[in-house]
Design a protein with these regions (language model features):
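"…together with the soluble PPM/PP2C metallo-phosphatase catalytic core" -> "…together
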Residues: 2-258
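C-terminal membrane-associated helical module and adjoining short loops/tails
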Residues: 234-288
Length: 288
């Protein structure tokens, strides 16, 4: 019986959820940077929404990673690096980003022409922190490169799904659940706790996201993806990691050519999952 892993998962999920909710409540009263208007944006319906859910996820998941019992020092440092890199550079893009260059390819094309966009800063920054996090938990240069790409690539991919209410969190929960199950099956409380803390923090903020009161933004989505990428890098064997990395690369490349929103809308199963918990189009949101 995987009792130790279940306890580790429970501790991670509870700590992540409690810290994320506390952070969201605190940030809605006093934002971490600027005032409430600094974080206000317009969503896909043309309605006001706040990005403060992102910093709340970063703070909640980071706090859980910092205090969760039993974490080895290097893994704890790697988790903090991943969430800080994704959240910090994602937050920079949230606050200072412009839309003249879009997508991974767009930012790199602009960089090749000497234009340093906020997106390019984010790509380089998350790449560097992802590689640093991987170096703390990997053996040898090849593993470090694969794991670093997995952390950074997952951070970027998660952000590509943050275009509709709840979508990025749902994708995170669906991707993180198998990692949590694998850790529990092996009765590994450390890896179970790592996967669970990000899932707990994300699930705790899902009602705000589905209610269209808040969204993860780059800060939250990048941090969620980076943590799940780190969890995959320390939970899966090399074949599994390479398979996941290949999927991340393929989906990222596909996003430059196709719209994920159109693909999801055109598939009955994906569309049903995407709409689960969301308010009807004609219903007015209850903003808080």
């Amino acid at each position: 019986m995987a009792r130790r892993a279940l306890l580790g998962a429970l501790a991670g999920a509870v700590l992540g959820a409690a810290a994320a909710r506390a952070a969201y409540a605190a940030f809605t009263r006093r934002p971490p940077v600027g005032d409430a208007e600094t974080w206000n944006r317009t969503n896909h319906r043309g309605e006001p929404i706040t990005l403060l859910e992102g910093p709340a996820f970063v703070a909640g998941a980071g706090a859980a990673a910092a205090v969760l019992p039993g974490f080895p020092v290097r893994l704890r440092a790697a988790a903090l690096l991943a969430v800080a890199g994704g959240g910090g550079f994602g937050g920079y893009d949230d606050l200072y980003g412009v839309t003249s260059s879009k997508g991974f390819k767009g930012h790199l094309t602009a960089l090749s022409k000497g234009e340093v966009t906020s997106g390019a800063v984010k790509i380089i920054g998350i790449g560097a922190t992802g590689l640093a996090a991987a170096a703390l938990t990997s053996r040898g240069g090849a593993d470090t490169a694969v794991n670093g790409a997995l952390v950074a690539g997952s951070a970027n991919l998660a952000n590509l799904f943050d275009l509709r209410p709840g979508r990025a969190i749902k994708v995170g929960l669906l991707c993180g659940a198998p990692l949590l199950a694998a850790a529990v099956r092996r009765d590994d409380p450390v890896r179970a706790g790592l996967a669970a803390l990000s899932l707990g923090a994300a699930a705790a903020l899902l009602p705000e996201d589905l209610g269209e009161r808040a969204m993860l933004g780059d800060a939250g989505a990048n941090a969620l993806g980076a943590l799940l990428g780190l969890a995959a890098s320390v939970t899966l064997g090399r074949p599994g990691r390479l398979a996941v990395l290949g999927t991340v690369v393929a989906l990222t490349a596909a996003s430059e050519k196709i719209s994920f929103t159109r693909v999801i809308a055109g598939n009955p199963v994906l569309h049903r999952i995407d709409m689960l918990g969301r308010r009807p189009v004609e219903q007015a949101p209850g903003h808080r």
